[in-house]
Amino acid sequence: MMSKSQTTTDPDWLHNSHAGELLVSEFMDPIGLTDETLAASLGIAPARLRAVIAGEQPMDADLDLRLARYFRMSEGFFLGLQLDFELMEAKRALNGELDRILPRAA
C-alpha cells in the first residue's frame, strides 16, 4: 500500500536547519560566543567554522569531536544533526519517489 502522507516530502513542510545553523542558535548565541573565539578554542581556522555555520560545508567527524569536547556533549551529537539535515534534504529531493517503492514483505 502506498503512503498518501506528504509530511516528509513536502518541500514547504518545515524549515530544515543545517547543523551549523543549530550550532549558532542553540550553543553560540545563548552564551555570546563568537565564531572567532570558538574556532580558537577548538584549534581550527575561523574560515572552516564559518563555512559550516553558513551551511557551505557539512559537519564532519573531526569538528563533531572538537565541539562535543568543548560543549561537553556526546560524541556524535553534531554529526547526528548533520545526518538529520541530509536525510530531510534527500527526502525532499526524492519528492514522492520513495512512495513508489514497495516495501519487501517479510
Please provide the spans of the model-predicted regions:
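Short, basic-rich loop-to-helix N-cap that marks the start of a DNA-contacting helix
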Residues: E56-R69
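The alpha-helix within a helix-turn-helix
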Residues: M28, A39, A68
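Short alpha-helical DNA-recognition segment
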Residues: G32-A51
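K/E-rich alpha-helical interaction surfaces of small helical-bundle regulatory domains
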Residues: A68-D84
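Short, charged recognition helix plus adjacent turn
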Residues: L79-A106
